[in-house]
Amino acid sequence: MPSQSPVITVDGPSGAGKGTLCMLLADKLGFHLLDSGAIYRVLALAAIHHGVDTESEDALVPLATHLDVQFIAEGELVKVILEGEDVSGELRKEETGMAASKVAALPRVREALLRRQRAFSAAPGLVADGRDMGTVVFVEAEAKIFLDASAEERASRRLKQLQQKGLDVKFDDLLSEIQERDDRDRNRPVAPLRPAEDALVLDSTSMNIEQVVEKALHYIESKLAG
């Protein structure tokens, strides 16, 4: 019998297009959305709002356990709602990023956020975006996707994004950054970046987003049909 609250996981390296794919899938399927990459920034922002020390595990664990956050897919955009307030813009501030780095280094906080992420699983279903969703957070997920693309293609996409914002960046610098991050993610001791054994690996190097969504939906529908 199909699950009443199926989980779809999408993992992969930085710049592969996970965020866009997950937003579109959640929108098309009418499922909840979890952006695990933003969860530490959300917790850091909640700590700042409540005057909680971002280096105190004792203070942060209860905040993480009861974190009141929603990720709302609106086409290719995602709104982050913290305690009823749209904080999408605040999440990108440098202060939030610095605080998130401190928060992410605390083991008990990471464990509390792991449990909080699992609590996102609810009817009618969940699309979870991250790096270890299918291998650690939702091991029993009904459908797992690992979205990949060559480092060169990811650097090219990033270059276009930054140039559209009027920034002067070099392709070789972006490529080096991506390759270094890939190396760190794939060789870290805890939850290294890798496809789950039962995941569909999609290489988006030579596909546009419409083709990626089509392949992903076909796979998800076949898995959910049992």
Swiss-Prot record:
Family: Belongs to the cytidylate kinase family. Type 1 subfamily.
Protein name: Cytidylate kinase
CDD domains, alphabetized: CMPK (cd02020)
Main location: cytoplasm
One matching Pfam family: Cytidylate_kin
Superkingdom: Bacteria
Enzyme Commission number, as recorded: 2.7.4.25
Disulfide bonds: none
Protein location: Cytoplasm
GO cellular component: cytoplasm
Main enzyme class: transferase
Catalysed reactions listed for this entry: CMP + ATP = CDP + ADP; dCMP + ATP = dCDP + ADP
GO molecular function annotation: ATP binding; CMP kinase activity; dCMP kinase activity
GO biological process: pyrimidine nucleotide metabolic process
Statement: the UniProt record of this protein carries the keyword Cytoplasm: yes
Assigned keywords, A-Z: ATP-binding, Cytoplasm, Kinase, Nucleotide-binding, Transferase
Transmembrane segments: none
Gene name per UniProt: cmk
Binding-site residues, ATP: G12, P13, S14, G15, A16, G17, K18, G19, T20
